[in-house]
Every structure is written in C-alpha cells, then in structure tokens.
Amino acid sequence: LSLHEYMSMELLQEAGVSIP
C-alpha cells in the first residue's frame, strides 16, 4: 500500500467504516 492509501484507511476506521 502507498502511504496515502494507508492513511486513508486509518481515517475510514476512525470514522467507523468497516474495511473488508
């Protein structure tokens, strides 16, 4: 993963979005 993708996933998790 790129740094941007990793940070985006972290933000989604913080927002309460489940990531498969």
From Swiss-Prot:
A single cellular component GO annotation: mitochondrion
Keywords assigned: ATP-binding, Ligase, Mitochondrion, Nucleotide-binding, Tricarboxylic acid cycle
GO molecular function, one term: succinate-CoA ligase (ADP-forming) activity
Catalytic activity reported: succinate + ATP + CoA = succinyl-CoA + ADP + phosphate
E.C. number: 6.2.1.5
Domain ATP-grasp per the UniProt entry, residue ranges: 8-20
Highest taxon of source: Eukaryota
Biological role: ATP-specific succinyl-CoA synthetase functions in the citric acid cycle (TCA), coupling the hydrolysis of succinyl-CoA to the synthesis of ATP and thus represents the only step of substrate-level phosphorylation in the TCA. The beta subunit provides nucleotide specificity of the enzyme and binds the substrate succinate, while the binding sites for coenzyme A and phosphate are found in the alpha subunit.
Description of how the protein assembles with itself and partners: Heterodimer of an alpha and a beta subunit. The beta subunit determines specificity for ATP. Interacts with ALAS2.
Family note: Belongs to the succinate/malate CoA ligase beta subunit family. ATP-specific subunit beta subfamily.
Record-given protein name: Succinate--CoA ligase [ADP-forming] subunit beta, mitochondrial
Taxonomic source organism: Canis lupus familiaris
Gene responsible for this protein: SUCLA2
